[in-house]
């Protein structure tokens, strides 16, 4: 595998580990799709986790502005999906800090652990395993900015946009692979439903 894995190499890893599957899936937000993607299924395997994280770190290092920040850069994720990627990227970059935000329960806002407080002016890269709707990254970005931290880039293993994907404006968005899936707003508009293809609900 290349130092920076190609799109086809990433897809092969995802399929070989069961992280990427074809079928008829309904996500928690109600969207229907012809693909299931859960990157943690690939991140279970150390070598794959290392390859994907190092590949992402190389994309960050290739950006001259971000490269200049590395000695003081923080890598921040949300629990739990982004944690393996965050640690892998931080190690490969030799960035200064890695930490995360979490929720007490599903409907609670994100927060940092006691005594973990981003510093005003702290330069941060937000990291996650996948960007689909971007809801978690939007909330995490707002949380960091409430402390005065500066988000300088987003870095995700897989970018799989859908009709509800957040707009992050001019903020650099780096990804090892971009995947396109067919999305349908509801059962009435879903071609897979019209074909009576069996449904599998995605619960996480």
Please provide the spans of the model-predicted regions:
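Short, well-ordered alpha-helices that flank and scaffold nucleotide-derived cofactor binding pockets
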Residues: 58, 87, 91, 142, ...
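Glycine-rich helix-loop-beta junction characteristic of Rossmann-like nucleotide cofactor-binding loops
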Residues: 60-69, 115-119
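PRPP-dependent phosphoribosyltransferase catalytic core
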Residues: 2-12, 141-204
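Conserved acidic residues
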Residues: 73, 122, 152
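Short glycine-rich phosphate-binding loop at a beta-alpha junction
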Residues: 66-79
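Active-site-facing substrate-recognition patch
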Residues: 1-66
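Short, glycine/charge-rich flexible loops or terminal/linker lids adjacent to PRPP-binding catalytic cores
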Residues: 80-125, 132-135
